[in-house]
Amino acid sequence: GRVFIDATYEGDLAAAAGAEYRVGREGQAEFNEPRAGRLYTHWVGAVGEGSTGLADNAVQAYNYRLCLTDVPGDVIPVARPEHYDSTEFLSLAEDVRLGRTTAEDTVAGYYKGIRQISSMVALPNGRYDGNNHHLAFLSTDLPEENWPWPTSGWDWRDMYARRLRSYTLGLLWFVQNDKSLPESFRTECLRWGMARTEYADNGHFPREVYVREGRRVVGEYLFTAHDAL
């Protein structure tokens, strides 16, 4: 046909066609946006230490959206990944012990177990959509390592996808087996696994990285904070 629409996360076709695009965060000065650029806040609290308001190439962290279940007979147990490194997850043990979350105040009824590291949204047939948990300091997101993704080739993207898969399975293995965590916590997590009939041709693991943000093609108008206020 005469027209091609690039509706992908990455925008590779748009870039190959020469379309102008942006990656990362604009600085505060470019559009006079007080909350733009590199900022650290505790939810909607005051701007924290290390904030500069400057532009950077940071994009929102990626993860895998898991299909998890605790239905007996449908659970595929999590296997220890080949490149497992428990030191990546040790801070989680202290978070669990202290009941520490990203919220400024204590979260009433904060669930101890799989729901402390994964946001669990119910699906049909006893399955759950396991996503990164916004209240967890350590969850299924792998921040910063994904920053090259938008402008990299598929060799790098495939390498990162393997790394992210190993990290994700390593996290699940850690919460189910590492003795730095309370036995009750590990026992609850051990109930869960991948759904037997999902992604059976890929080790019951999702095929695609959840790419939340990539290139942003520059169009006729650029929406800024001033349009939303």
Predicted regions and their residues:
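Flavin (FAD/FMN)-binding glycine-rich loop and adjacent Rossmann-like elements that form
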Residues: 1-3, 7-229
